[in-house]
């Protein structure tokens, strides 16, 4: 019996790590850039919330983009769920559970900072969802306000990667 315990523990740890959402709490918009993979030539930011219907509808498309391009694209979600008053810990758990249910494994920020500061940093008026694509230097290349058009986003990313 004892020989099976380490194996079972290993299986549980692998299953948890493979399916677990990467949710990071952040208050300062200036630190968003630190959340990107330094190696990725394309960086994508998607601002969303669990209560936003078009945000939820586009999650599968974002997961597809993340899976399609792998390490060539650093995709970062920014959840605005904390902007609604309530129990912050419960809301953060809700976001984490939502990401797990949707099988989202790319990094997501649980944003707890000032919404105006975030809007200024990303140059948007607070209307979500919004998806912004940057090159490695941080120069904005493309943005889409509203529900993501997956084919347009993929075409833009392919163009940035040299047609790969």
Residue ranges and their predicted role:
Residues 22-43, 66:
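A short beta-strand-turn-helix
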Residues 40-43, 48-51, 127:
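Short pre-active-site segment immediately N-terminal to redox-active cysteine/selenocysteine motifs
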Residues 102-104, 111-156:
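Thiol/disulfide oxidoreductase modules built on the thioredoxin-like
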Residues 44-45, 75, 131:
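Hydrophobic beta-strand anchors of alpha/beta hydrolase catalytic cores
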Residues 17-21:
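Boundary at the C-terminal end of the N-terminal hydrophobic targeting segment
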Residues 6-15:
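Bacterial N-terminal signal peptides
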Residues 47-64:
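Conserved redox-active cysteine motifs that mediate thiol-disulfide chemistry
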Residues 59-101, 113-119:
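Structural microenvironment flanking redox-active thiols in thiol-disulfide oxidoreductases
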